[in-house]
């Protein structure tokens, strides 16, 4: 299988369970990398029986219609910010965040506290943020969505924090995935805040580094800016992100952080992929997702060719037409 790097922990646990329940199935070495990288690898090699992405657009844009013709949205996570507690700015932000947890959401004081948090992260000249590349990792553009939504929510100006970070090259360090950013934080404190982070990765990663004696944590964000609440879909859509690199320009829609999965048309072992997804949709699998900060979408939502979904999976999914109020978080046209 090939899957978004932030699914590494949940999917590794599911693969271990798969080995237990299906001892006769040989499991190949999974590739956990940026969603775009994984999808392009499948388009080039057709080696995967399963491909999973951390957004709703990568699989359709890269694999439809020649390599896959549907995707199943199975979980939603939320953006968080990983904080280096070994730096003064990190300590200050964490202290303010704890204060915000005691304040009434949307009150004047709560708004002021969140403004102070983002001022430190985005405006202070001596802080540097870590972000991933929008072209290799969805969390790269999703981090930009968070900054724009924070500007809109707290400053009534979507560009306020985005400009402060992305218009100043010294303000951010960009890598292909958020895993690479954690290494930067750990090795030399060169970034104090990682904006390209999901709960699904922040929970196990911060635990791992804490066990190594490094003082880092993550802070959660309000639902109206964390891309983790489907009921805020219309607010998320008030902003979008345009990114240019090496002459290539792309505009990204700010959608909830939804994990999707497909079984490619040329899957070498389709039945093993079906069995994995049956495990994922089982009570055991759903608990594994929750353990890593992924809220299951039940039933799963099929975008694309519903009739191509294997029969065994049908009891656990519905076509997008059945939940049309969520259609705007998927690409505009079905294949």
Where are the predicted features?
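Exported/periplasmic ABC-transporter solute-binding proteins
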Residues: 1-23, 31-44, 55-56, 63-64, ...
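Acidic, Gly/Pro-rich loop/turn segments at junctions of secondary structure
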Residues: 51-68, 80
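Generic, well-ordered alpha-helical segments
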Residues: 34, 51-54, 73-74
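Short, charge-rich binding segments
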Residues: 71-73, 120
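Residues embedded in well-ordered beta-strands
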Residues: 49, 73, 80-82, 260-262
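Generic beta-strand structural signal
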Residues: 70, 79, 127-129
């Amino acid at each position: 299988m090939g899957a978004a790097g932030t699914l590494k922990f949940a999917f590794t646990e599911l693969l271990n369970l798969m080995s237990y329940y299906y001892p006769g199935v040989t499991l190949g070495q999974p590739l956990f990398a940026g969603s775009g990288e994984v999808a392009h690898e499948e388009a080039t090699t057709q080696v995967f029986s399963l491909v999973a992405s951390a957004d709703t657009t990568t699989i359709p844009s890269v694999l439809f219609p020649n390599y896959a013709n549907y995707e199943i949205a199975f979980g939603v996570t939320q953006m968080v910010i990983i904080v280096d507690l070994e730096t003064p700015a990190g300590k200050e932000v964490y202290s303010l965040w704890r204060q915000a947890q005691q304040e009434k959401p949307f009150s004047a004081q709560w708004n002021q506290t969140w403004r102070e948090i983002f001022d430190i992260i985005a405006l202070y000249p001596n802080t540097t943020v870590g972000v991933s590349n929008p072209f290799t990792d969805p969390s790269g553009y999703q981090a930009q969505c968070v900054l724009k939504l924070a500007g809109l929510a707290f400053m009534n100006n979507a560009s306020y924090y985005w400009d402060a970070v992305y218009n100043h090259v010294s303000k951010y360090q960009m890598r292909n995935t958020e895993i690479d950013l954690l290494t930067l934080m750990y090795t030399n404190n060169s970034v104090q805040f990682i904006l390209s982070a999901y709960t699904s990765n922040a929970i196990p990663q911060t635990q791992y580094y804490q066990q190594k004696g490094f003082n880092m944590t993550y802070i959660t964000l309000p639902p109206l800016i964390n891309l983790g609440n489907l009921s805020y879909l219309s607010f998320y859509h008030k902003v979008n992100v345009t990114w240019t690199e090496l002459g290539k320009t792309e505009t990204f829609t700010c959608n909830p952080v939804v994990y999707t999965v497909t079984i490619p048309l040329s899957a070498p072992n389709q039945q093993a992929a079906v069995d994995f997804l049956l495990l994922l949709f089982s009570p055991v699998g759903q608990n594994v997702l929750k353990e890593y900060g992924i809220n299951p979408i039940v039933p799963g939502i099929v975008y694309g060719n519903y009739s191509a979904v294997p029969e065994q999976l049908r009891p656990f999914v519905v076509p997008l037409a059945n939940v049309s109020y969520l259609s705007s978080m998927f690409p505009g046209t079905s294949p």
